[in-house]
Amino acid sequence: MKLNMRFTVGVFFILAVAVSSCDTFKDEITPEKYSEAVKNIDANWQLSAVSRNGIDITDMMDFKRFHIVLNEDNTYELKNYLPFIVKGNGSWSVDDPIYPFHISFKEDGMENEVKTLIGFRTVDGKRQMTITVSPGCPSNKYVYTFKQVTE
C-alpha cells in the first residue's frame, strides 16, 4: 500500500510539473511590431580593392582615386572614372530597400539601365559595399570593393 501511495504521489508530481511547464512564452516584441531597418547606401564610396576573376589586382593601379557618390535623391556621380558599368552620372535604385541584392544605374540621357549584384558587410566597424561587374568582356568578372567615406 505504501508503494502504491508513493507511485501515485510521484505520478501526480510529474503530471503537475509537465502541465505547469506548458505555459506559452510571451515575447514583449511581437513580429507585427518589429520591422527591419532600411539600408541607407547613399554615401560617398571610395574604391578600396579590385579583383578580376578572383585575383586581387588592387596594387596594379591607383584604384583608390575612384569614387561613386550615391546621393539621397537617388542620383549618382562618378569621380576619377575607371572602367565601370556606366560611364557618366545619372540615377540609381536598389531592388529592395531593406534587403538590397541588386543596384541599377541609369546614365543621364540613356534609355536603358544597368543592373548588377551588390553586397554589404562590416569590416573593423566600417561599412563596405561590393559591386560585381563585367565591363567589356563578359568572361572577365570584376569585384569592386568600396569603403564608405565619411567627410
Where are these regions (language model features)?
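Bacterial N-terminal signal peptides that target proteins for export
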Residues: 1-9
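Hydrophobic helical h-region of N-terminal Sec-dependent signal peptides
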Residues: 10-14
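C-terminal motif of bacterial Sec signal peptides marking the signal peptidase cleavage site
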Residues: 17-21
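Lipid interaction determinants
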Residues: 23-87, 97-151
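Short beta-strand-centered aromatic/proline hotspots
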Residues: 90-94
